[in-house]
């Protein structure tokens, strides 16, 4: 038997927030005039996102007087510090992750006390003692479980977690490895009105996903993996810890850079994955244009992105958790048979 993803559990905080409501909050927070308001509305309508989730209720409030996290004034001053945002992460992340873990374990009919390894993935918050320890306490995971934390690797970090899980199971076939991604992206809203923040504020939502990896004859078998760095995009995407939350650099050129980079890698993909025979793709839903550019670079039909587009539509970009949301939909889809190439 091979190592397989036997179940994936998902969770989102609160009720879905319509993209139009978030746009209204952004207009208020950025103090936009009529023309800039129309530009922002256009961007949000064309995002491919209908709903997002957040641990912060403020994004669906109509008046600043109703805010509970941000200051109750139009300038949002004083703007919440990184410390204040991490306090929310510490309070909310474990509960959200717990829901995803319980869903994954229930699907697989596996008890928490039988887990041997726990891998926590997040790029939107850090605390010690960590979220993984709180999960152990809440779920009854043994104190002897081997713990790993993958922090600050961004949207592709779940791939790193799954690769680690596969290697652990191959090293010890009795292993039961739980990979947990929890991302509270909306904690890091930035009010400065620039291109980076405009794009980031329009895309990201909160969510958690848990994948159980073990030897099994059922599930998504992990067959192979590949990691390549596209140095051309080094200055177009970055994630740094600032004084007022984590700060993102997110260039509008990323989709075209991905298109160019993937075309260069096509021969390598053929050699590594027998690419021309692959019929199903799980592409990280980083944004509508990213999905389109990857689709065009590979010469794929629009239908291959249907699950990724639905995750984007209903949840936005949840960083590392997003690809697990896509794989969960594919795991439940009986029409998908054969190999899946996942990309992030």
Predicted regions and their residues:
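Short coil/turn connectors at secondary-structure junctions
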Residues: 1-2, 112-116, 143-146, 171-177, ...
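Condensing-enzyme catalytic core mediating Claisen C-C bond formation in acyl metabolism
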Residues: 1-88, 176, 185, 189-260, ...
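Short beta-strand segments
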Residues: 7-9, 121, 151, 176-183, ...
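Hydrophobic alpha-helical hairpins/lids featuring a short glycine-rich hinge
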Residues: 77-119, 123-125
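Glycine/charged-rich beta-loop-alpha catalytic/anionic-binding loops adjacent to active sites
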Residues: 80-81, 113-117, 139-151, 191-196, ...
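Claisen-condensing/thiolase-fold acyl-transfer catalytic domains that form or cleave C-C bonds
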Residues: 98, 123-124, 142-144, 149-170, ...
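Phosphate/pyrophosphate-binding loops at sites that engage ATP/ADP/AMP, CoA/4′-phosphopantetheine
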Residues: 100-115, 263-279, 298, 330-334
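Acidic-glycine-rich active-site phosphate/pyrophosphate-binding loop
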Residues: 126-141, 179-190, 235-239, 291-305
């Amino acid at each position: 038997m091979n190592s397989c993803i036997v179940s994936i559990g998902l969770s989102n905080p609160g009720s879905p927030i319509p993209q139009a409501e978030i746009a209204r909050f952004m207009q208020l927070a950025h103090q936009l005039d009529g023309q800039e308001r129309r530009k922002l509305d256009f961007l949000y309508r064309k995002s491919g996102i209908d709903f997002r989730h957040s641990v912060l209720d403020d994004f669906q409030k109509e008046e600043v007087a109703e805010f509970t996290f941000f200051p109750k004034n139009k300038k949002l001053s004083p703007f919440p510090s990184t410390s204040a945002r991490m306090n929310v992460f510490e309070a909310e992340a474990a509960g959200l992750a717990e829901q995803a873990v319980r869903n994954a374990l229930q699907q697989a009919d596996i008890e928490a006390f039988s887990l041997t390894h726990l891998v926590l993935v997040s790029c939107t918050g850090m605390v010690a003692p960590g979220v993984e320890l709180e999960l152990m306490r809440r779920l009854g995971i043994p104190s002897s479980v081997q713990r790993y934390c993958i922090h600050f690797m961004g949207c592709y970090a779940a791939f790193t977690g799954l690769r680690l899980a596969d290697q652990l199971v191959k090293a010890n076939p009795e292993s039961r490895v739980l990979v947990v991604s929890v991302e509270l992206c909306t904690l890091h809203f930035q009010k400065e009105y620039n291109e980076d923040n405009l794009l980031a504020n329009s895309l990201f939502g909160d969510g958690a996903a848990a994948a159980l990896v073990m030897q099994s004859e059922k599930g998504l078998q992990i067959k192979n993996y590949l990691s390549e760095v596209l140095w051309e995009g080094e200055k177009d995407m970055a994630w740094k810890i600032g004084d007022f939350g984590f700060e993102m650099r997110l260039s509008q050129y990323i989709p075209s850079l991905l298109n160019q980079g993937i075309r260069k890698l096509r021969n390598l993909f053929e050699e590594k994955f027998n690419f021309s025979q692959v019929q199903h793709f799980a592409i990280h839903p980083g944004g509508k244009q990213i999905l389109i550019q990857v689709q065009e670079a590979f010469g794929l039909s629009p239908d291959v992105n249907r699950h990724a587009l639905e995750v984007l539509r209903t949840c936005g970009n949840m960083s590392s958790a997003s690809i697990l949301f896509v794989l969960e939909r594919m795991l439940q889809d009986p029409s998908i048979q054969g190999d899946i190439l996942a990309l992030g």
